[in-house]
UniProtKB/Swiss-Prot annotation:
UniProt record, GO biological process: regulation of translation; translation
Disulfide cross-links: none
HAMAP family: Ribosomal_uL1_B
Record-level GO cellular component terms: large ribosomal subunit
Protein name (record): Large ribosomal subunit protein uL1
Subunit structure and binding partners: Part of the 50S ribosomal subunit.
Native organism: Streptomyces coelicolor (strain ATCC BAA-471 / A3(2) / M145)
Sequence similarity: Belongs to the universal ribosomal protein uL1 family.
NCBIfam families the UniProt entry points to: rplA_bact
A GO term for molecular function: structural constituent of ribosome
UniProt keyword terms in alphabetical order: Repressor, Ribonucleoprotein, Ribosomal protein, RNA-binding, rRNA-binding, Translation regulation, tRNA-binding
Lineage top rank: taxon: Bacteria
Function per UniProt: Binds directly to 23S rRNA. The L1 stalk is quite mobile in the ribosome, and is involved in E site tRNA release. Protein L1 is also a translational repressor protein, it controls the translation of the L11 operon by binding to its mRNA.
InterPro entries: Ribosom_uL1_bac-type, Ribosomal_uL1, Ribosomal_uL1-like, Ribosomal_uL1/biogenesis, Ribosomal_uL1_3-a/b-sand, Ribosomal_uL1_CS
Gene: rplA
Length: 241
């Protein structure tokens, strides 16, 4: 057995699989069981009781994480004229129009988020096959198709992330790095949870959040008590559930 396998088994042995952990307790345990030697990512995964094949059960939106993700996103903006200048001034990493659209169509993907002005969406729409599968296609519902490109860039750079339930009814959120203070990770988790609950489709029946788990880049998943929506910074407090 490899040293890596032994480390994972030892980490997994510290987790009670019959228990749903409070967020603060899960964060501390995730750090304790992380086997990476670098500043790993902390992620939360939700299994939702929705059928994403049905339009009225799609869960999609954005959330502003109060403490960001620990990574500054590279933002590409499709804009011209004054709006292009505003995007650059706001800190956009890549700004352009026709030539840039052509570059992306040929496979340029050195960015994490895309913003476009409404007047260019007729052309940007042709990039659906490239951007769509990667969750990068600009959309008015997520604020990434907008005339106010400066605000969109500032929001994304400040920790705003976009999410969408996948075909298996799962949602994944990066809520920070293992170097983050425990409180910051829990507060980021709370912001994500609050937004997911707010977006519950009226057509969804039965239990909405079926499962939730927190993990690090190279660590085991820790079952979360997603029913706990208040007093998230308390480890053990049954009255807070």
């Amino acid at each position: 057995m490899s040293k890596r396998s032994k480390s994972l088994r030892a980490a997994d042995a510290k987790i009670d699989r019959d228990k749903l952990y409070a967020p603060l307790e899960a964060v501390r345990l995730a750090k304790e069981t992380s086997t990476s030697k670098f500043d790993g990512t902390v992620e939360v995964a939700f299994r939702l009781g929705v059928d994403p094949r049905k339009a009225d059960q799609m869960v999609r939106g954005t959330v502003n994480l109060p403490h960001g993700t620990g990574k500054t996103a590279r933002v590409l903006v499709f804009a011209t004229g004054d709006r292009a200048e505003a995007a650059t001034a706001a800190g956009a990493d890549i700004v352009g129009s026709d030539e840039l659209i052509d570059e992306v169509s040929k496979g340029r993907l050195d960015f994490d988020a895309v913003v476009a002005t409404p007047d260019l969406m007729g052309k940007v729409g042709r990039l659906g096959r490239v951007l769509g599968p990667r969750g990068l296609m600009p959309n008015p519902k997520t604020g990434t198709v907008t005339p106010d490109v400066a605000k969109a860039v500032n929001d994304i750079k400040g920790g705003k992330i976009e999410f969408r339930v996948d075909k298996h009814s799962n949602l994944h959120f990066i809520i920070g790095k293992t170097s983050f203070d425990d409180t910051k990770l829990v507060e980021n988790y709370g912001a994500a949870l609050e937004e997911i609950l707010r977006l519950k489709p009226s057509a969804a029946k039965g239990r909405y959040i079926k499962k939730a788990a927190l993990s690090t880049t190279m660590g085991p998943g820790i079952p979360l008590d997603s029913n706990r929506t208040r007093n998230l910074l308390v480890e053990e407090d049954p009255a807070a559930v």
